[in-house]
Swiss-Prot record:
Organism whose genome encodes this protein: Pelotomaculum thermopropionicum (strain DSM 13744 / JCM 10971 / SI)
Keyword Aminoacyl-tRNA synthetase (UniProt): yes
Protein name from the UniProt record: Serine--tRNA ligase
Compartments reported by the entry: Cytoplasm
Superkingdom, taxonomy of origin: Bacteria
One Gene Ontology term from the biological process aspect of the record: selenocysteine biosynthetic process
Pathway as given in its UniProt record: Aminoacyl-tRNA biosynthesis; selenocysteinyl-tRNA(Sec) biosynthesis; L-seryl-tRNA(Sec) from L-serine and tRNA(Sec): step 1/1
Family annotation (InterPro entries): aa-tRNA-synt_IIb, aa-tRNA-synth_II, aa-tRNA-synth_II/BPL/LPL, Ser-tRNA-ligase_type_1, Ser-tRNA-synth_1_N, SerRS_1_N_sf, SerRS_core, tRNA-bd_arm
Assembly notes: Homodimer. The tRNA molecule binds across the dimer.
Any GO MF annotation of the entry: transferase activity
Cited SUPFAM superfamilies: Class II aaRS and biotin synthetases, tRNA-binding arm
Length: 422
């Protein structure tokens, strides 16, 4: 959430930021309501001052043995009007707050201009796509032929975009999760969290999923609880409405969780395989830091996610999202895209974002600085990585002509020394 004072005092900057994003927000209505609120505040303060004067005068007259019936009536009338206007101000506050919750973050000055994903600049690439010497098969065919992933029964039991891992498939999924967690905790300094997979509405508002993206969430019927779309939600809200010790920043957490997404806007895209499932596993990286450090921390977080792909030997590239492709809460984002031979293109496997104080302001996460004053932390997160997409990339990039799949060396200790599936 943006700072109310900033939005009020910098209308040109806010309009420019929204124009850069290519989004439309009813700012005229916001400023109209804000002006109405300020006018009512001025009026009610005048009334309260008058009521205080009248009250003091009534008290003075009573001490001298005199009655003041007209003043008593005036004070009652003032109190009634004050109550009414206070209620109107409260209603305006709620409407303004709702509008603020639907205004996206302001892009950082380093974010490139662009209308959409096609205009995201490539920052760097790593690795070289393999020359197979045969036509590579898609991961869903590999998984089915090796009998390690069952999409048909996933559809029978749960519906479209669900699957079963079985045998070495289940073990490979678990190996990838444990490998990622071990790497981030042992080498990158993250403290592991195992979070709840269900959160309340305040948590979803805190990280920016609600109210704007309600249709993409799985809500529990009859309750204000939601299945998490990412571990970002519970881990960021771990410190909601808290004041952190500035000397302990940055705080680094990693977390494995299942993730649940309705994918309401993804109809017709990646309908086969593991790329776009309603339920999938992910290892998330979350940081809380001082404002002046957040963009350095974004570079480090991105490098931590990249290290997973490097150790697995998976070719990838890093793109920086342009203004038109930037997520609602993010000030700047790098996407990691892994090479998938069957698509003959790179597919997103991680988004690493700096949210500046946008989430912290919504969630009330502050720290006490060296002067003893509180200010909002900056929050960052990124996938470290999406597990299903990592498995898909392994199956496709490590497939062999005989139908088997070579297990990446980094995963063999987690697979009981197994070097090949099939």
């Amino acid at each position: 959430m943006l700072d109310m004072k900033f939005v009020r005092n910098n209308p040109a900057a806010v309009r420019d930021a929204l124009a850069r994003r290519g989004v439309s927000v009813a700012l005229d209505e916001f400023y109209k309501l804000d002006e109405e609120r300020r006018e009512k505040l001025f009026i009610v303060e005048q009334m309260k001052n008058r009521r205080n004067v009248v009250s003091e005068e009534i008290g003075r007259l009573k001490k001298s043995g005199k009655d003041a019936p007209e003043m008593v009536l005036e004070m009652r009338d003032l109190s009634r009007q004050i109550k009414e206007i206070d209620e109107e101000i409260k209603e305006l506050d709620g409407r303004l707050q709702d509008m603020l919750l639907n205004i996206p973050n302001i892009p950082h000055e380093s974010v490139p201009e662009g209308a959409g994903a096609a205009e995201n600049p490539v920052v760097r690439t790593w690795g070289k796509p393999r020359d197979f010497g045969f036509t590579p098969r898609p991961h869903w065919e590999i998984g089915e032929q090796l009998d390690i992933i069952d999409f048909e029964r996933g559809g029978k039991v749960a519906g479209a975009r669900f699957s079963f891992y079985k045998g070495y498939g289940a073990r490979l999924e678990r190996a990838v999760i444990n490998f990622m967690l071990d790497l981030h905790t042992a080498e990158h300094g993250y403290v592991e969290i195992f979070p709840p997979f269900i959160v309340n509405r305040d948590s979803m508002v805190g990280t920016g999923q609600l109210p704007k993206f309600a249709e993409d969430m799985f809500k529990l019927e009859g309750a204000e609880y939601y299945l998490i779309p990412t571990a970002e939600v519970p881990v960021t809200n771990l410190y909601r409405n808290e004041i952190l010790d500035g000397e302990k920043l940055p705080i680094l957490h990693c977390a494995y969780s299942a993730c649940f997404r309705a994918e309401a806007g993804a109809a017709g895209r990646d309908t086969r395989g593991l790329i776009r499932q309603h339920q999938f596993n992910k290892v998330e990286l979350v940081k809380f830091c001082r404002p002046e450090d957040s963009y350095d921390e974004l570079e480090k977080l991105t490098a931590d996610a990249e290290k997973v792909l490097q150790k697995l030997g998976l070719p990838y590239r890093v793109v920086v999202l342009c203004t038109g492709d930037l997520g609602f809460s993010a000030a700047k984002t790098y996407d990691l895209e892994v090479w998938l031979p069957s698509y003959q293109e790179y597919k997103e496997i991680s988004s690493c974002s700096n949210f500046a104080d946008f989430q912290a302001r919504r969630a009330g996460i502050r720290f006490r600085n060296a002067r003893g004053k509180t200010e909002f932390v900056h929050t960052l997160n990124g996938s470290g990585l999406a597990v299903g997409r990592t498995v898909a990339a392994i199956l496709e990039n490590y497939q062999e002509a005989d139908g088997s799949v070579t297990v990446p060396e980094a995963l063999r200790p987690y697979m009981g020394g197994l070097s090949r599936i099939g």
